Amino acid sequence: MDYAQPLAFFAHILEQKRLVTALEGNASVIDRQTGLTYVTPSGRMKLLLEKEDICVMNAAGEQIGGRGRRSSEYLLHEAVYQARPDVTAVVHSHCPFLTAYALRYQNFDVPETCSLREVFTHFT
């Protein structure tokens, strides 16, 4: 399956729900059957991403698709995928709410949640 479109859609949701700000944060999905990893590009507003912007990486770590430059956090995502074969998606959000939590060390409720499974089910 080509995960570029659902990942771009999910990136829109991340920004609409204010889980990322400005150019911060990134997300990826790995297709365990093909070995391809789809990752949001670096330095781009998530709300403006299109399918063609999503970077496609092969198992050797080479970018084989996408208009953008892969996220600088790509290697972090790959480390998660290697360490946890049960994980198929990673979101590194720089969420303002979690940043505030880290600064204040207080409990709080995150106002929005979003499931990658729900997003990707819509496209399958």
Language model features by range: what are they?
Residues M1-T124:
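Glycine-rich flexible loops
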